[in-house]
């Protein structure tokens, strides 16, 4: 049973680590900048678990423990391999103008971005996954299950409902899940990889951003996700054809704009901002 469950995988965070393996972290709530290890950040105890409530103690503490953690782990090897390939290609000047991902890799990349968004505790809280919707216990099928569990002296019907809600949200293998639908939506957009030479991108405890501030047109879709201090991923429906699935060089002065987007969001959504170098955070927060 995994107690400390990461919502940002360590293979991703390590891309933003300094030479000593530490990540510079700005805690917006405390107003402090400090260095820490990737294994100690972006995690919560039993984040993806559902506790049995009003249930037979023989069932244990959690409903199907570690199921989501195991599913994430199955894909993270594939995600990590692709991410390192992208970083390697984008870092090589010889690949300027080259196509970065093939069809299967585009699918994997969209799955990864969706996973990063949906498994985040803020996203899960917005979806009320740990709440039983009013009236759902009156649904005939739920009543039948509840009666059966009571007869078997198991109980815990509401816990099963909560677990099912998480599966619909997180499970890529569940037909019609949010993970499936989000991946499909991203595949319907064009992507490009923006690169910076000297200034650095930051990332955060909520790295995937949908839409960029009030200047973004309502009909324009933009998804921003930093992959590395010098490489970020953009999805959109208005990207120029010449950068589709290719590298686009970002003017250095525009990097501050992207980094500041995290600082504009509420602290409960983005409490921590991460960077490879302390000076990048100091400039951002001053």
Where are these regions (language model features)?
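Alpha-helical structural context detector biased toward long hydrophobic helices
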Residues: 1-4, 8-286
């Amino acid at each position: 049973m995994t107690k400390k469950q990461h919502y940002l995988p360590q293979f991703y965070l390590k891309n933003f680590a300094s030479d000593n393996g530490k990540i510079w972290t700005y805690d917006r709530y405390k107003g402090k900048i400090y260095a820490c290890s990737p294994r100690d950040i972006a995690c919560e105890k039993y984040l993806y678990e559902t506790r049995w409530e009003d249930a037979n103690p023989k069932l244990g503490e959690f409903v199907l423990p570690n199921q989501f953690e195991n599913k994430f782990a199955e894909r993270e090897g594939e995600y990590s391999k692709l991410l390192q390939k992208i970083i390697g290609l984008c870092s090589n000047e010889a690949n300027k103008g080259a196509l970065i991902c093939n069809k299967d890799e585009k699918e994997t990349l969209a799955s990864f971005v969706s996973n990063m968004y949906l498994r985040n505790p803020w996203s899960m809280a917005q979806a009320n996954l740990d709440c039983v919707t009013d009236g759902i216990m009156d649904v005939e099928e739920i009543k039948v299950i509840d009666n059966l569990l009571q007869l078997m002296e198991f109980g815990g019907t509401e816990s099963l409902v909560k677990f099912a809600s998480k599966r619909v949200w997180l499970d890529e293998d569940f037909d019609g899940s949010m993970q499936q639908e989000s991946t499909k939506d991203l595949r319907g957009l064009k992507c490009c990889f923006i690169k910076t030479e000297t200034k650095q991108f930051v990332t955060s405890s909520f790295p995937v951003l949908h839409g960029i501030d009030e200047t973004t047109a309502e009909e324009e879709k933009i998804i921003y996700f930093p992959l590395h201090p010098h490489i970020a991923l953009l999805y959109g429906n208005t990207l120029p054809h010449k950068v589709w699935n290719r590298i686009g060089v970002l003017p250095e002065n525009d990097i501050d704009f992207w980094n500041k987007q995290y600082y504009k969001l509420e602290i409960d959504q983005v409490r921590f901002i991460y960077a490879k170098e302390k000076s990048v955070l100091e400039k951002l927060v001053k």
